[in-house]
Amino acid sequence: MKKRILTLLTVIAILAGIAVPVRAEETVSEDAVECLTEMPYEALPEEDFEFDEDSRTITAYIGTSVDVIIPRTIGDVPVENISYNAFECARDYVHSDMATNQKEGEWLPMRCLILPETLKSIEDSAFTHCHDLETVICYAPLENTNKGLFEECKGLKTVIFVNGVGEMDNYLFNYCKNLKTVWWKGKVNRIGVQCFGATGLEQFCVNAKNIDSCAFIGCEDLKEIHIRSGVENLNMTAFAMLTGIETICLEGIDPDVMEADWVNLQNSTVTILVPEDTTDEQLQLVTQKFASAYIIINKSQVQKGSCQLSENPMPDIDGIVGEYGI
């Protein structure tokens, strides 16, 4: 059974009364499609994959390379989907909490995964329990990642959405305890429930319209989080169980979009930064939100200050994949 919640009693308390916001829909314009960055790396041979031409879906990876570069086409048919079972060969159940007959070493230790821009959809949990997976470079402008795509990938460190992503769905990186870098182009419509639950993130810049309940719950190493402007809904339980948090930076946010649910963090040292041009009335409202959620214990913890980050550059992909000899 997947560990969706950190502790039952905690989440019963946290989630009581929470309404999950309706997903925002967004279409990709033709101009945006034309501007896509194409995957520059040579794909693995077509015969390394079982492929259903009718649905344009990869149904199984049967190759032996631990660094997997998905082809754009197989038999001249575009690769658009990846099924749930496609990477069953790379799932490590031995080092999970699941009952299994699998023996040590009976899985492919996939290290690096590169996805082409032709992909449109990947089924829920398609890479769950791929514990050896360290790096994912996604060129596909996915409208939705779907749920639990990389949940419990314990070795996952770096994920880059080169052409952006529409929605980062529930439990996307839940329990990816070694995850340090997640980068995406532009603004996402939604960061789902427990999307980054119990990850190893230490500093994080978030550019999103909607941030759902418990989005960052239990990220014990997270010290600093920057929320970009343009947020339309922020559920305060996103900050639950951030025991090491030092700074929450709001780079321009309307207090009315903050859902002040009970968090009970009661952190006496965290600083909440708001822009210098925040009015006294807005400052008071933001303070009330954090205080009523029991995130802070002293009103002086909410302060005006400089917190606007410069543009967050995309990590050096060539350098990252070069470590795998790609």
What residue ranges belong to the model's regions?
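Sec-dependent signal peptide cleavage junction
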Residues: 18-32
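Structural signature of tandem-repeat unit edges
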Residues: 46-54, 63-80, 92-121, 131-144, ...
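Short beta-strand/loop segment at the start of cytosolic alpha/beta domains
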Residues: 30-61
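Positively charged n-region of N-terminal signal peptides that target proteins for export
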Residues: 1-10
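Bacterial N-terminal signal peptides
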Residues: 9-17
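Acidic, Ser/Thr
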Residues: 61, 85-91
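A structural signal for leucine-rich repeat
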Residues: 150-151, 196, 216-217, 239-241, ...
